[in-house]
Swiss-Prot record:
Family indicated by similarity: Belongs to the DNA mismatch repair MutS family.
Protein name, as recorded: DNA mismatch repair protein MutS
Annotated GO MF terms: ATP binding; ATP-dependent DNA damage sensor activity; damaged DNA binding; mismatched DNA binding
Cited function: This protein is involved in the repair of mismatches in DNA. It is possible that it carries out the mismatch recognition step. This protein has a weak ATPase activity.
PROSITE patterns: DNA_MISMATCH_REPAIR_2 (PS00486)
Database matches in InterPro entries: DNA_mismatch_repair_MutS, DNA_mismatch_repair_MutS-lik_N, DNA_mismatch_repair_MutS/MSH, DNA_mismatch_repair_MutS_C, DNA_mismatch_repair_MutS_clamp, DNA_mismatch_repair_MutS_core, DNA_mismatch_repair_MutS_N, DNA_mismatch_repair_MutS_sf
Domain of life, source organism: Bacteria
Pfam families for this protein: MutS_I, MutS_II, MutS_III, MutS_IV, MutS_V
PANTHER family for the chain: DNA MISMATCH REPAIR PROTEIN MSH1, MITOCHONDRIAL (PTHR11361:SF34), DNA MISMATCH REPAIR PROTEIN MUTS FAMILY MEMBER (PTHR11361)
Amino acid sequence: MHRVMTIRPDIPPQPDIAAPAEPPARVSPMMEQYHEIKAANPGLLLFYRMGDFYELFFEDAEIASRALGITLTKRGKHLGADIPMCGVPVERSDDYLHRLIALGHRVAVCEQTEDPAAARARKSVVRRDVVRLITPGTLTEDTLLDARANNYLMAIARTRGSAGVDRIGLAWIDISTGEFCVTECATGELSATLARINPNEAIVSDALYSDAELGPSLRELAAVTPLTRDVFDSATAERRLCDYFAVATMDGLAALSRLEAAAAAACVTYVDRTQLGKRPPLSPPAREAAGATMAIDPATRANLELTRTLGGERRGSLLDAIDCTVTAAGSRLLAQRLAAPLTDEAAIARRLDAVAAFVADSALREQIRSALRAAPDMARALARLSLGRGGPRDLASLRDGVSAADKVLAQLSQLAQPPHDIAAAMAALRRPSRDLCQELARALADDLPLLKRDGGFVRDGYEAALDETRKLRDASRLVVAAMQARYADETGVKGLKIRHNNVLGYFVEVTAQHGDRLMAPPLNATFIHRQTLAGQVRFTTAELGEIEAKIANAGDRALGLELDIFDRLAAMIDTAGDDLRAAAHAFALLDVATALAKLAVSDNYVRPEVDGSLAFAIEGGRHPVVEQALKRAGEPFIANACDLSPVPPPFPPPLAGEGRVGAGQIWLLTGPNMAGKSTFLRQNALIALLAQTGSFVPASRARIGIVDRLFSRVGAADDLARGRSTFMVEMVETATILNQATERALVILDEIGRGTATFDGLSIAWAAIEHLHEQNRCRALFATHYHELTALSAKLPRLFNATVRVKEWRGEVVFLHEVLPGSADRSYGIQVAKLAGLPPSVVARAKSVLAKLEANDRGQSARTLADDLPLFAMTARAPVEPPPPSEAEQLIEAVRALHPDELSPREALDALYALKAKLPKAD
């Protein structure tokens, strides 16, 4: 479900979003103020500050009450009807904001901008103003963000090309880190780009939002905001960008096309509006060249579960399996790389070189990882400080970051010739000023509050004026302590206490049994009764009032001086912002390199050979996610080879048991359900993706020619919202592959044609294979239960038949998970159905039907078959299933199936573990 917001300060409020302000005579001054502010911010939930709560009224209250599960009450009347109202405490507002933003809502935060006492003196309502617009794509607070994921705002612009060919300009920013990127693509590539970047919020023009072709897909985004066309005006784009970056021309910052500039300018314009003039520091727009990354369409990303499982969980995804990073920034960078594998051979090699350096030196790797654990999230701390939302702990984060940089540099100095990426990271870590770090260390106290308004974050001795003010404040408090002792002595009440709250200020508190003593002469002349509670009585004195004024003045002066120091330090940090951001990125880069090295060593990954050929040769390939799951269960993963190269590989065939390298760019894979066909398909796609990400891969050897597009058609799901059946979804995805796959593409197809009649499905699968072979000429893996398709290898020279090995023993199917040359003649569907728990009568009946089908011509009519086979009345007399083999018999059969002369040492060890797992469990 998506939400739509319109932020348009330049147009009148829309009556269906904000109720018009009532004439002053009909509403209270406070409600008149509310209507005025609400009308200026249509389409946003208005958090209206009233004391210690943010209140919501009218439709906003009803929406928030449903979304947050909080009580809906009422406050007065409006036009004769009750005013719906709900509220959230200010101190817990971040929790509620996080939930609203996650649901796609936008919020305007309206604060009190003067002291209520000043408003009372003016005999007027407290002044209030909107201080921030919070939208899904413009978050900076840690409490509202996922530390391990980027939070992107994307602008989408379109231009009408010649001959009706449209072009799309895209710009995306993360204001919490300063990242800013742009690119241009064809309309047909938009969905893949959106899936890769996965923006938290997209802004588009009204016209594009309503477009018949692109509008439906845009409205499927998590949050989309239509804006007026002038926001995307390319004629004013460069001027707006120059204004944001405070430069005379963009030539020295970025070379953008007119369309890219329009999208980039829309981004900074929207940021200006939502941040109310405060400008987060952004890097100059980085232009992403067309074809620089592997194109992966949305269906393929979902099917391969790259960053999220089909259920939407991170756990169980490829990212979860390979993420060994120790910093939030490193985790974000790894996710970025996984979403956008490179297609440039040299850039991939540079990443692999960095990983290899840490694979070769385990001691250095662990030293770096230990130091990185102390590196804070500097980029997000910088963004908060620049927007005035930072606190003392953000200052400390930057101090600690520079300190961690020195430790990392000292350890990296052990490398005699650091690879390119590591050398670049070292240079970036040297950039921040060490003088700034020392200044922060001198200024900040050891125990820091979360908020700067709490004070106490400046170290004693840093500034003389602050020290003097603190002494005056603290001395006044000592006077209060002495006064408490004197009052206790004068009244004879040993339990007398002097306390403080925001309502009474300083007051004297005694138990109820002593209250009458202070209210009786002569003590009542000194102690003025203020409040009686269940167990206590409270009093004030003139002397306490005088002391309170002195303490308050000293405390306010001390806090004011601390805030001045904070602003001074924040300004110093802002000046050094570019250097600090470079160091933050260097930490992330080193974290990813060391994390992938740790993964490679612990899970036995190898460095892939990635080149510009069309090769695809994998030995001993494994599925990275499934292998980890089996390892946790104490079971081995059966490795397999795959060769989709146009020529034989340059290295020897794999050892027996790992599978044998075939000779075909298209592999037709047959075998029963649950034998591992889908796992085999996916693992090869994931190995290619990991290799071009710059990671080592789960294999014993791998050579991969650059893959420019990755396609996956696996699994089955309908799309009822669009009126698409499961089969229709399958055909749409297959059509995308056949229309777009190039010779550099890698395609995996699973069970094409199964969602319709047998001969229809067989015909579609047949024609699809021929098209892949003759037209696309790409590398492909095609799994099927249509065994008739294996005959195509006789006429298609680059088609290779492969099968997943199984054994049948005493009516049971044993899955060996080995991929070998050849084809399967059976699918063992009934045996799998039996494993799934179908009733024995159904299994027996299915076997009898299958036997009849196999004994007769497959073209025999269903009516004849129905006449020949007795109905379910015969099921009761169905033969009894033979008992399953005992554990000892299964063990004997497994030993007989082994061929010791064909096993490598590693395979022999795996086989031994597998046999051990079959032993009866001890009681």
